[in-house]
């Protein structure tokens, strides 16, 4: 029997161990997509206890706790922090096979030096030891980031945000670069009830009137210029349902006017407006050399009762299953026809789309850019061991694993950076298996460089 999560965790061959310990383990982290709060980084917040740092905004954990039957008061409610923690400890003890189990114990080991498995029986001992350390200066938010050798992290930000935290951090002596990401979902999703109110906010932020779809593009262009001044290198879009129908500017303007006048839009009209906005934004991204991330197929807020009670992003989303390959191909080609396709990263929440996305990415290339269109890492419901292995196998079978930009946390927790370690161990194990099965030569120096590139260097080259 192998020891529980020891130094060779998930590394099944000698080659895998060599690649991880001599290459992947030492590389810094470029976390190009997360949902961390930049205000907490600026303030260098000291987390009060494990409950605050673990359960403050993590819907992965909330879903698992609900599956255990705990009351909402112990999950997102006003219950005592220690009682919430005990409920989480019991949840983790029962979470065999779930990535939360491995993530939680990697966090305990890497940040706190705690190797005792979390359970209700061990909860008090772990609570006391971890909380004592959380009160020291070594465990402020900035030090948690530096502890994991994070060189860059990209937060997720709305075009109307003033980015005061990012701008202030630029003036401070903080070794990690905290960069904004441009996420204009609220400008794109005109079917949302608050779209008219958002148009007013965007107009105020951009300092210009918005009376048409073309005006929306101009306003977003103004805000993108501001984001670029704060170091933005990447955008992000959540695409749900029909997101592209070719149309003229006049047709997109008509759809915008209809929506602002209270009209009910057809699916085709939604696709026309969204496609017009997205292709124009894509051309702007290409002009400014920033990457475009497309996160596709989240089916959000399925429990309307809980959405009314708690709002969005609280653990009631799941995978969608609509077909979108022709639409995606036409959308990307629209920009490529003018040689205006930006670097693009494709993700689907439904793993059934993996072969399609990997093959789609190979349709669009450019001299001097390694894998200009990337098949993105296993996302959300897929960022577990099996999901990562599947994504790596699909990418290597259809595309080029060696040019892959690697992992991200997609997290709201400052303890989540060991997820990069989890990915790197799985990556090294996959490559190690190929080598020791005689499927690839044991050229360890070459392979170590490849692992270093996938772990960090490729992302630096791609985004910076």
Residue spans for each PLM region:
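Metal-cofactor-binding active-site regions of metalloenzymes
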Residues: 1-288, 340-342, 346-358, 362-464
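A short acidic, glycine-rich active-site loop
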Residues: 266-267, 316-322
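C-terminal amphipathic alpha-helical interaction region
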Residues: 292-294
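Hard-cation-handling environments
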Residues: 298, 303
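Short glycine/proline- and charge-enriched loop/turn segments
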Residues: 307-315
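Divalent-cation-assisted or electrostatically stabilized phosphate/pyrophosphate-binding catalytic cores
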Residues: 324-328
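Short, basic/hydrophobic alpha-helical segments
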Residues: 331-337
């Amino acid at each position: 029997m192998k020891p529980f999560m020891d130094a060779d965790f998930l590394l099944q061959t000698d080659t895998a161990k060599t690649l991880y310990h001599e290459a992947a383990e030492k590389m810094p982290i470029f976390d190009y997509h997360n949902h961390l709060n930049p205000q907490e980084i600026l303030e260098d917040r000291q987390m009060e206890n494990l409950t605050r740092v673990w359960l403050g905004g993590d819907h992965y954990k909330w879903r698992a706790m609900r599956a255990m039957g705990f009351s909402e008061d112990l999950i997102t409610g006003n219950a005592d922090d220690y009682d919430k923690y005990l409920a989480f400890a019991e949840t983790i003890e029962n979470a065999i096979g779930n990535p939360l189990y491995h993530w939680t114990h990697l966090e305990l080991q890497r940040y706190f030096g705690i190797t005792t498995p979390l359970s209700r029986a061990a909860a008090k001992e772990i609570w006391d030891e971890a909380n004592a350390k959380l009160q020291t200066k070594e465990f402020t938010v900035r030090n948690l980031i530096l502890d994991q050798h994070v060189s860059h992290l990209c937060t997720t930000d709305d075009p109307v945000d003033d980015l005061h935290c990012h701008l202030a951090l630029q003036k401070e002596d903080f070794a990690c670069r905290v960069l904004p990401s441009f996420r204009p979902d609220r400008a794109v999703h005109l079917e949302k009830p608050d779209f008219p109110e958002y148009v007013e906010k965007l107009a105020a932020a951009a300092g210009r009137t918005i009376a048409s779809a073309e005006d929306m593009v101009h306003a977003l262009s103004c805000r993108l210029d501001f984001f670029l001044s704060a170091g933005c290198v990447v955008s992000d879009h959540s695409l749900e349902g029909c997101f592209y129908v070719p149309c003229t500017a006049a047709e997109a303007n008509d759809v915008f006017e209809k929506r602002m006048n209270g009209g009910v839009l057809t699916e085709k009209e939604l696709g026309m407006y969204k496609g017009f906005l997205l292709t124009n934004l894509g051309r702007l991204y290409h002009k400014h050399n920033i990457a475009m991330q497309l996160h596709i197929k989240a089916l959000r807020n399925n429990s309307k009762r809980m959405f009314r009670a708690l709002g969005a992003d609280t653990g009631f989303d799941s995978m969608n299953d609509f077909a979108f390959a022709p639409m995606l191909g036409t959308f990307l080609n629209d920009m490529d026809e003018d040689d205006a396709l930006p670097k693009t990263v494709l993700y689907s929440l439904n793993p059934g789309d993996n072969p399609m996305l990997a093959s789609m990415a190979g349709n669009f290339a450019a001299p001097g850019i390694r894998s200009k269109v990337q098949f993105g890492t296993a996302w959300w419901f897929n960022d577990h061991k099996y999901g990562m292995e599947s994504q790596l196998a699909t990418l290597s079978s259809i595309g080029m694993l060696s040019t892959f930009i690697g992992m991200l946390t997609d997290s709201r927790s400052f303890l989540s950076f060991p997820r990069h370690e989890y990915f790197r161990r799985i990556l090294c194990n996959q490559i190690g298996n190929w080598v020791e099965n005689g499927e690839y030569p044991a050229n360890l120096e070459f392979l170590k460089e490849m692992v270093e590139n996938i772990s960090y260097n490729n992302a630096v080259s791609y985004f910076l």
